[in-house]
Regions:
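N-terminal interaction/assembly modules
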Residues: 1-119, 123-137
Length: 137
């Protein structure tokens, strides 16, 4: 299973947890009941990343809020966009993955799962995060 597929599955789990407003291990385990994965290792990789995002939730939400236009509130952002932004910010800031790859793939996920404006909205926020954090390619 390639990294893009793992990223998409990670996003889907994050989105599911956002909708449920529950971040318990039981809910994470429930997600995997209906999904066939290549290996237990892939499952553990996804679970680990989701748990790290949950552990960094407050900081990630703060980063999102700090990068919104002044007249926007975080409550206005769709659950799809929140999940995608958390995933991208975690991968760029915490895992130090190449931001160009992360942004490209998350924008593609936004086109697939988000609203018409999701991809440009996410691209704009993440471009600001890259600039503010002096991320290198």
């Amino acid at each position: 299973m390639n990294k893009s597929t793992i990223r998409e599955l990670t996003f889907k789990l994050l989105y599911s947890l956002e909708v449920q407003k529950s971040f318990e291990n039981e809910d994470i385990d429930l997600y995997f009941e209906d999904i066939e994965l290549d290996s237990e290792k892939v499952k553990e990789e996804i679970k680990s990343e989701v748990n790290e995002i949950i552990n960094n939730n407050d900081e990630l939400l703060k980063q999102i809020s700090n990068n919104l236009k002044s007249d926007w509130k975080i409550e206005r952002i769709s659950k799809v966009n929140i999940a995608l932004l958390k995933l991208a910010m975690y991968e760029m800031l915490n895992k130090k993955l190449p931001y160009k790859v992360v942004i490209n793939e998350v924008v593609e996920l936004a086109k697939k799962y988000g609203e018409d404006t999701s991809s440009s909205f996410i691209n704009g926020i993440l471009a600001t995060v890259v600039k503010e954090n002096n991320l290198q390619a």
